[in-house]
Amino acid sequence: TKTFKKVDKIVGPGNAFVNESKRQVFGVAGIDLLPGPSEVMVIADESADPAFIAAALIAQAEHGSGKEKIYLVFTDSSQFEIINSEISMQIQDLSHRDLILEIFQKGFLATHVRNLEEAVSVANFVAPEHLELQVKDENISFLQNNIKTAGALLLGHYSATALGDFIAGPSHVLPTGRSSRFSSGLRIEDFFRRTSIIRYDKESLQKASQSALLFSEMEKL
């Protein structure tokens, strides 16, 4: 355009206009991914602190686009009302209280599961951007080994999504909208290209020629 010089690749997050621009130039220029509104899922067992869970859910709702997705998957049914009470209490003095309430009304889903195996199934289907495992230490390995579709796993009661976003170290440009089923977050490999190197000598060519001929005949070349 008159404003921007042509580039080979565009990376990084942005608003809906940035995403649509990246979508339209894909194929002419490379892109990393199309990260949409932020998402968090919290898997909680009976050891989880309702105050921590509430804080994690509220922190997600504070992102500000109005389209955030918040998922709570819990094994202890007695905790749900306590978590609700914690949410109500913690948002009282927040400046974005009305927006947070709207997001909880439109973008919050809580699911009670009978065990952690069911929690794994839910997580692998939703494929959330951030997945907090607020469970006993001895349950972390099972979840970590069996959940295959999450942009980032935050392990244990003290690994808040905000830490992953700001200071933990790994990229927080992560796939959303279930796209972690087939993609990963922005990483150093996104700034590299790979070229295949092929070299035969006379002897290796002779060994391979018959196989190459068979493929050629199969394709009627």
Language model feature labels by segment:
Residues 15-17, 46-48, 61-64, 74-79, ...:
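Glycine-rich beta-alpha junction loops
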